[in-house]
C-alpha cells in the first residue's frame, strides 16, 4: 500500500506532463494484483508490467481493469508469446532479444503480438553497446511499437569497448548505419577488459583489488 501511495503521489505531482508505468516483477499474488491494479488505475497509472507470474492469472486480471497489462518475464520466445496471445493474457508484450531467444525469435514474438492486436514495447536487459545496437536494429523493423522503448544500457557504463559511442541525443537513440551492426569494436579495449585467465581479479581484505 505504501508503494502504491508513493506512485499515486508521483503521478499527482506530474499531472499530464508525463505518464507513469509500474513494473511489479511478478511480486504480487493474484489477490494482491487485483487490489493493486485497481488502486494504480485510480491513481492514473497507464500500465502495469507483469504483476504476477502465472499466465492464467494474467488472463483473468487483464479482463478486469482499464490499466494496460504488460507481459515480460512470461515471454520466453514465440511459443510463450503464442500461448499468452491465445488466451488474451496481456495488452502489451515487452520484447527482449535475449529473453526471446535471439533477434529472429524476437521478430516472431512481435509478429504474434501484431496478429493478436497486442501492443509492443521494446525492452532492455541493460545490454552494452553491441546488444543495444542489435535491439535497435530489430525494433526499428517492427511495424508497430506503440509503447516505445528505452535502450539505455550503454548510458550506465563508464567505459566503452567500441571505437565510437552510440548516438544518444534528445532522448533518442539513432540506429547505427555502418556495416553489419554499425558498431566497430576497439580491439585494444576489448583486450584490456578480457578475462581469459591471464589477468585475474583478486579480492583482498578491506575490499582492495
Q: Locations of the language-model features?
A:
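Metal-dependent enolase-superfamily TIM-barrel catalytic cores that perform enediolate-based chemistry
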Residues: 1-65
